[in-house]
């Protein structure tokens, strides 16, 4: 994990992702009849418990349970997607989820959330978007838009937008750069994620 998160440029993207993940620590308002908003409330409750515990394992579990993990894993490989051996996919995917959980657990104390609001949802071209507003203890306020994919009768979190920037491209850039720095060897990323 340290090898992936070592440069300041890489940390910027992951910090932005962290702000999005940490958005759901203290609920203030929920549109009760909206299933997408109700889903995000469940995510919020579990993130609150995991965040308070400061446990990478609990945060990893929340990402695994509510994230669109298959999509995220595929997208994060970017131009190297076709080079991942089928036998390496399970290790890579679970390693990616653990990476997100560990990094979030490390960074969570830096972004103390005072409260948040889940505002509403809207159907978009690529999924359902749930809008929220995050209030940090220092008075900073962030608007975060969550992108959900519908899976049967439930949803999965696919992305989050902070300051008009979607977060998954930051993870993709991080992973692609790591692979490129290791001679284009996808197995190097798999190895660091499965440690």
Model feature map: region roles:
Residues 159-195:
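Low-complexity, intrinsically disordered terminal/linker segments enriched in charged
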Residues 33-107:
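Early exported N-terminus immediately downstream of N-terminal targeting peptides
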Residues 1-9:
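N-terminal secretory signal peptides that target proteins for export/translocation
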Residues 49, 53, 57, 82-87, ...:
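Surface-exposed, polar/charged faces of alpha-helical domains
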Residues 26-32:
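Sec/Tat signal peptide C-region and signal peptidase I cleavage site
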Residues 14-25:
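Bacterial N-terminal signal peptides
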């Amino acid at each position: 994990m340290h090898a992936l998160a070592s440069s300041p440029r890489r940390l910027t993207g992951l910090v932005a992702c962290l702000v999005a993940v940490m958005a759901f620590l203290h609920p203030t308002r929920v549109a009760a009849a909206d299933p997408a908003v109700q889903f995000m409330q469940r995510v919020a409750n579990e993130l609150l418990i995991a965040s308070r515990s400061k446990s990478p394992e609990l945060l990893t579990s929340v990402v695994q349970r509510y994230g669109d993990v298959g999509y995220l894993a595929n997208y994060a490989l970017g131009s190297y997607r076709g080079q991942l051996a089928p036998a390496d996919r399970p290790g890579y995917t679970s390693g990616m989820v653990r990476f997100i959980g560990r990094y979030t657990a490390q960074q969570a104390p830096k972004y103390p959330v005072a409260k948040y609001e889940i505002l509403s949802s809207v159907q978009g071209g690529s999924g359902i978007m749930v809008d929220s507003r995050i209030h940090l203890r220092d008075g900073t306020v962030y608007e975060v838009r969550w992108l959900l994919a519908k899976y049967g009768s439930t949803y999965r979190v696919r992305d989050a937008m902070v300051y008009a920037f979607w977060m998954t491209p930051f993870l993709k850039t991080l992973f692609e750069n790591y692979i490129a720095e290791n001679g284009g060897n996808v197995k190097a990323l798999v190895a660091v994620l499965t440690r």
